[in-house]
């Protein structure tokens, strides 16, 4: 990527409109705009489908929108659109959001939430026939049994970062610390 600012195209204005002219829950389904126009009609369909797939809280809908908009702005700066993203773009985005010394660096938990939002977007895009393959790679992981359920093998998005759980954090007495 070189020096910051090199290799980036001029960025268009991509924003979130948190309310739309509709009744009920649809009023809280965000719109993604480029300037004064809808960014992409298929992306809008994704947001309209979120309540049907269990995302009903207006706070969750808003979080999805802002996660997606930051990604769209990044892609726009790279000269790409939402449905043209590749695994290399995800890697570059990770460097920008997690590893650079930039002011906009985010926590692992925030990164994982953004990955979950984008993963859902691209899985939806695959189901709708908009893309052949999502820009994320997956690997099989063992999910241990919980609450009487059997353990199973599941596909895990490689872009997720491991976040320390409270059970992983232990007190170490000073005598044991070296």
Residue ranges of predicted features:
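Compositionally biased accessory segments in Actinobacterial proteins
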Residues: 1-3, 140, 144, 158, ...
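N-terminal core-binding DNA-recognition domain of tyrosine recombinases/integrases
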Residues: 44-59, 68-151
